[in-house]
């Protein structure tokens, strides 16, 4: 999703709205279409480890690989269901095997019906073979079509679906004279169109609807820059849109060092070889085939993009022959293009440090991270992050597009016009970390091959909340305590109030948000603020118990971060991979508890419960999209 801004028009909480009202970031830019109308609904269930222990028949299976165990579990749990194994399974850094299955009907995918199993493998977890930690499920259980629509040819031509999505969403794509080419069974590509950054495609698939029925659709994929859309068009009535998913969420280096949120927190420094060879063994300036003297390498490619276009490879980027990426910058310089070298360098630096830190915490090749060359470590390569500094396609925002593993991510950092002179988003680390974290959460939740699992309203909200949480955790200072409050986007927006409803604070009088606040919120950034507030409580509960490592990287003991800050970042990340597709807050909370149970044998159970319960997500909390029920209760052993 788009990354930073808070939408206007929030329903009446007793809120002191601290952000300037902004247009909703879930709209199609300039085309008056609200994508919130087409969000996928919450259908997933999540069975936590505590619930699994009550069902011993499905908690443990005959010893085998984690994939075999997971497959057997799905067969037993969903007998007579047709499904396929998704080719993105892996064993995570914490020893959990993550396996995902897609439900099919007559050989056609049900695109929003998934089953994910978190299981152990005896090779990695001695004595745990055959055991399942938890699972998530959104399989369709309603009536099935009697026969295959492919045999009956009971669907429209895919070109009609492309025309339908153009008209329904008012897309700037022209398809007159375009041709259709077969890519694979049930999937085609449209050649000869204009207005999209790549050739649109269409795939025949089913969608499980919230009313319990099944719709045959054409999934039309269109990348138009500010939006990278998967539009599910009815395969019979191609003017009808069922759902829409948007992938976009909005040497020596002289930079603001990692940990400084923006130029007000410190001065620029010259850093020599700032990469971590454990996580970037090719350095930031090589990809195993080529050595570069510009801001490109295995993890990212950064450039100036004033026209907002797609031809990034031929765009300008700093390329000092002596590898000294040292350029002048002051927040008082104007116009912004006069310091573009410094801007691109800063964006390249911050994004690469994100890559390295997240790698240490578990976002590696197998988990679907962003690299050209995966060096035989699993996953799909050829997907560095395209970093566009001073992108001309917008202002006062930033965004990140996350297609599935094997396709490059794309970040756009804009100029902000709230100050005079304008401010460049590349210099606010919190904005860049927030955007990069969209790539992290979209690749982990649902698995590397599925970037459609943060589309439901609470799921999308958590996508925004994770971005704020990681950006805030990184900026903590040595003297900070749980009484320290932080705003989001204060510098770039030229406002001490930032761009969120409230500061992040453990003080209920400063930030009163609780789980039931979501009943009055219908915009992902607002809902994300509630989620990040809960995670901020969790962060400080773990810091109070384990202390705070103020260094730039975690210190591990037996695979566990030794301090509370990095431990919180680790279990939140592990929870992303454990939870089901399109989770709600309750399911994501349970996934974090299961992540801690796996990593530390639940030694932080009460700290986690108390953090969530303080903000209304306690034992009795229940999800209902229209009437969430809050709870401040913790388990009896935590009272």
Curated annotation (Swiss-Prot):
Q: Give the positions the UniProt entry annotates as the active site.
A: 435
CDD domains named among the record's database cross-references: M36
Q: Which InterPro entries match?
A: FTP_domain, Fungal_virulence_M36, Peptidase_M36, Peptidase_M4/M1_CTD_sf
The EC category is: hydrolase
- Which Gene Ontology terms of cellular component type are present? extracellular region
A Pfam family reported for this protein in Swiss-Prot or TrEMBL: Peptidase_M36
Function, as annotated: Secreted metalloproteinase probably acting as a virulence factor.
This protein is called Extracellular metalloproteinase 1
Q: What broad taxonomic lineage does this protein's source fall under? A: Eukaryota, Fungi, Dikarya, Ascomycota, Pezizomycotina
